[in-house]
């Protein structure tokens, strides 16, 4: 009975989170709903909330792969063409390549950390799934507005 009750409570919290995220993301103009990440981690979020994934610094599904110089040049061009205001990087990964792309782009591009590979320590933003998603939502909204 307790497990069933806790499952219902958590399901309700997830539904409230989804509603809140949708409302927050709706505050971003459609032409600014463009994502560039350090690797492909936001595809489901993009599909669910109406974002376009412009590209990823590491073009494969693993962080062990290294992008080629032509991959990076193509991504810089895509960032400039789409006028992407932010590159979202995992808070637990180095942001060196994102910084290089930001500096090479002929537009202002900020680097915004997200929680995607792991949760943060207890008591900090991103320490639970719900907190992680709230924190990421705030970061995405602030990065794209």
What is each model feature region?
Residues 1-145:
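Extracytoplasmic metal-acquisition and chelation regions
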